[in-house]
Structures are given as C-alpha cells and as structure tokens.
Curated annotation (Swiss-Prot):
Listed GO CC annotations: cytoplasm
UniProt xrefs under Pfam families: Cpn60_TCP1 (PF00118)
Family: Belongs to the chaperonin (HSP60) family.
InterPro entries: Chaperonin_Cpn60_CS, Cpn60/GroEL, Cpn60/GroEL/TCP-1, GroEL-like_apical_dom_sf, GROEL-like_equatorial_sf, TCP-1-like_intermed_sf
Name this protein carries in UniProt: Chaperonin GroEL
Amino acid sequence: MAAKDVKFGNDARVKMLRGVNVLADAVKVTLGPKGRNVVLDKSFGAPTITKDGVSVAREIELEDKFENMGAQMVKEVASKANDAAGDGTTTATVLAQSIITEGLKAVAAGMNPMDLKRGIDKAVVAAVEELKKLSVPCSDSKAIAQVGTISANSDETVGKLIAEAMEKVGKEGVITVEEGTGLQDELDVVEGMQFDRGYLSPYFINKPETGSVELESPFILLADKKISNIRELLPVLEAVAKAGKPLLIVAEDVEGEALATLVVNTMRGIVKVAAVKAPGFGDRRKAMLQDIATLTAGTVISEEIGLELEKATLEDLGQAKRVVINKDTTIIIDGVGDEATIQGRVTQIRQQIEEATSDYDREKLQERVAKLAGGVAVIKVGAATEVEMKEKKARVEDALHATRAAVEEGVVAGGGVALIRVAGKIAGLKGDNEDQNVGIKVALRAMESPLRQIVINAGEEASVIANNVKAGEGSYGYNAYSEEYGDMIAMGILDPTKVTRSALQYAASVAGLMITTECMVTDLPKADAPDLXGAGGMGG
C-alpha cells in the first residue's frame, strides 16, 4: 500500500479552502447577464467556449492533492445541482464558496464546527420553506419564455423556441436539442407516436417524391412474433381487403414468403400494406407494443396470452388517422385509443419511473410517457461555427432544464433577489446555542452572495446595490442587464424555484461537511525511479 500524506486542523482547512477558491473563482465569472465566458482547452480539436458553470467545474483538476480535494468537493455541488434541476450550477458554487469561507473563519475563531453545521442546516430548512411560499406557478407561455431566456443568458430567441415547443407537445412531451445545419434555430414538431423503425421493403413506398409510405386511416396489426408464413396472415388480409382500408403490420419481424406476398399484393394494388419491425428489444419491445395498442385501441397478438395470428379479427386491430413511414422512422398520428385508457397507461409508466434505479431506464420510460401523452419536438440549433454551435447547444439544453423545473415547482424573482428576501424573512431565527447562531448568520450572509456576484460581474459596487435591494420588498431588485432597479417579475427576470432550492440545499450540504473536516489523507507522490544511465552492456 502506498505511503500517505496526512494534514490536520488548520493546515488541512487552509489547503482545502485554496482549492475551493480556485474552482469557485473560475466558475463564478460566468454568473449573471454580464457574466464572461471561460475557454476550455481540449486535447484534440478546437477549444470549447462556455458560460455553463458545471462544464467549467468538470474541467478543473489541481496539482496539489489537498487543494484538489477541496475543488472536487465543490465540483460535487455543481454536479448535484445540475442533476437535480439541470441549471443553477454557478449559483450553487457561489453559495458553497461563501458558506465555506465564512464557516472556516468561524472555526478558526474557536467555534464548534458541528454546531456551526447544525446552524447552517437549520437556516437552510427554514429558507426552503420560505422559498416555497414565495413561489408563483409558471403555466403561461410568456413566463416559460422568460425563464428560458434568462437561463440561455438573455437569448430571447431560445426562450421563445422552448415556450413554443412546450405549447405544441405539452408539459410532458419530449423536447430534444440537436445540432442544426443552417444559421437559424429551427423547431420541428412530430405529433403522434414516433419510433425508430422504418419500412421493411422499399416496395411499400407510395410517395416516391418523399421516399415514404403514407397510409390514411389504416388498420394496425400488432404481433409479438416473427411472421414468415403467409398462411398466418391470410384471414386478416382478407378482412382488411373487404373493409377497403390499408394495413400496417408491426411485428418482431416479417420475412421470407410473408414479406414477398405482402410486397406483391401492394404492387398489384390488391391491398395496401406496409410492414415495420416493432421498436425496442426483449421486455421493452413487449411494453412498447402494448403502448401502441393502447394508443390505437388494438390488441397485441401474442402467443404468451393465448392469441394466435390466424384467429385475429378486425376487432383485434388498432386504428389511427394516419401513418407515415420512411427509411428509419414510423409515426402513428391520432390513434383512436380511449383517452382514459391512455391516461391509465401513462400513470402506470410514471409509477415505473419512480421505481426505476438506472438513469437509462428512467430516460426510456420518460420517452414512452411523452410518446403517449404529447409528441416530440426537436429544437435544431443554428450557428456559424462548430465552436459557437457547441456553446449554444449547451445553453439551449440548460434553458430547457430550467423551464421544465419552472413548470414543476413554479418561479421566484430572479437575479438573486429571492434568496435575499428569504434571508430577510428568517433573520430572527435562533439556534440552541451561540455557535449555532453563528452558523445561521453564515448561511444568511451566503444567501446574498449570488446577487453580489451578479453585480460584480456587471462591474458595479456590490455592497451598495445589495443594501438597496435589501431595503426594498417583494420582487424589487436590480436588473444587471439594463442596470436599473425595479420589479424583477414584471421585468421578466425569473428563476425556477427548484433551481434556487437545489442550489441552496446542495451548497449547504457539501459546505457543512467541509467545515467539519479536521483531517485530510492523500497518497504521497511517488518518487521517480532513478534512471539506469551508464549501466554497462553485455560483454562481447
């Protein structure tokens, strides 16, 4: 086992604080409407330019191992805030730095670290309760656009795009961000259920100009098996031909004789058919087939539940208003499924989301909810260069997370004002002893730090503006963008409550642990082995 380097007490805390400050100082230059960019060098390709706090934090590793431990713990604050709310990473870092700095000063002055931590925790619990009271629901498009604009660093076009996307696919719909091909941002909305499987044969194409298959008011056959024998399909094909409607077959696979016969029937115009593979694999495929069945009021023909393809009737088939299939996607638009049944299915999947343990499973389940509940919107980000594209895409993703958080828990006045109001409301809070009171004061002082940092980044005097804002009430604050005082909510400067709450909770959690640190242990650097220069070769 490698030898260890151990530091105690003040020696350890000073080193740790130095690491915290390096990381926090790099991150906090990005805060607010007049925050600056940070350029990150990459081992290959062009450097990345970003104003996203967590991206900056993730890049920082320090040479001194004790300092690095401090930096890594604050990095954890930014990452946790990012995971919980998708934004607020810089705010969380600024809060953590303030609590740690003030807390360590108090420890150096002889306060009990555990009582300090209890005081900080007490203040945060009270602050979160007050935040909830200040929170205003965020339901209309205008408020959603404002939240998106603020989170995308005052880029109005991004805010409007996100609001438009949410309006079209609903609050539950899937909104994804992709790199576009032009200079302008675009919004593509896919209504209905889309899955990543295309037609099994190009001979099904009936719209050559777009290279796609379009079926109007089709029946939809859902089979959880491979179909290779045409005999199994004949009863259904005959019934559909009599009804004079097209047919979409969604099965594990359609191959051989069955596929050939379907192609021939389609080309001769006897019956209009298209076949696609079912989406997903294994158990997920069964679940997705069931989703399609719910959406189209059909039944999944599965031998597991005793249903045979040969005995399928028109009653077992689903129906939709329209189906569009191209090389690699299928879209089912306006399934005839009963609204209550669809809602029941959505509730069931939501339950699974809560119980899911892996992020991948959770993401896939959320996609399924969106496909059933709303639709899918794709925001295509336009930019002139690759570097700008990456930076802008990261901003749009941040803004999207922020708007989702706003819809979930509501909004509060932005620009650091909400935390100042909360601090004012709980100023009379008392702990069990004097050390806890100091901990409460440390937390209250930290709640001013986001506003102060926004003002510093705007090149103004932080103390003057912080005092002016404290003297006001409600959503009265300072707009660093236009350099004027006023009602933040009326000016459209909003922060999602969830983002502010997460930033405060995670900052206090990690900072509290760091204040109570008394000893740090790390590996000693290995001494370089002496090189063997001058060793003689073998005698000849």
